Amino acid sequence: DSNTALLWRDMGYRAILIEGIESRFNDLINNTRGYDTFCINNYVQETGDDSIDNILGRSTVELTDDNFVLMSIDIDSFDYYVFGSIKKYRPKVVIVETSSGYTPDRDFVSRNAGCSLKSVAELGETIGYKCVIHTGNAYFVRDDLVDLLPDYDYSLDVIYSSPADIDSRQGK
């Protein structure tokens, strides 16, 4: 499943798509042919030449605070660290995969097994993002845009969806 395909496929958004696994990258190229996408075959690292900032900087797409609408981080391991390493860019919305089996009061961060909602939400606050919903992924809105959202209780225990909640919404 893709967190972004609806946007670039059906709504005409431009996308930079990064895939480290070559066979999946080849599928990505085939699936995005004819759309306004820029595909990059690269593993993302926390620092160095393969940091998210450096990889995005090598694309031909000019990214500004106004036109960088969404970043989705789904690396199946150290999403937390990649989210925390973003320095140059300020997307309006960031989606970060979490290990949803942890309740919203639990701190957990691992390079090999993901992170809890609480841990990534606290990280988001330190880098200027507010966590506003959790569906297995944590959805963050840039601090300067939070006032545009409806008046709602965005506390973690309210926005958290457990694996059972997610399964029931998907008809499982």
Please tell me what each predicted stretch does.
Residues 1-58, 66-69, 73, 100-102, ...:
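SAM cofactor-binding core of SAM-dependent methyltransferases
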Residues 28, 32, 83-87, 131-132:
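Alpha-helix C-terminal capping segments
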Residues 72-84:
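Active-site glycine- and acidic-residue-rich loops that bind
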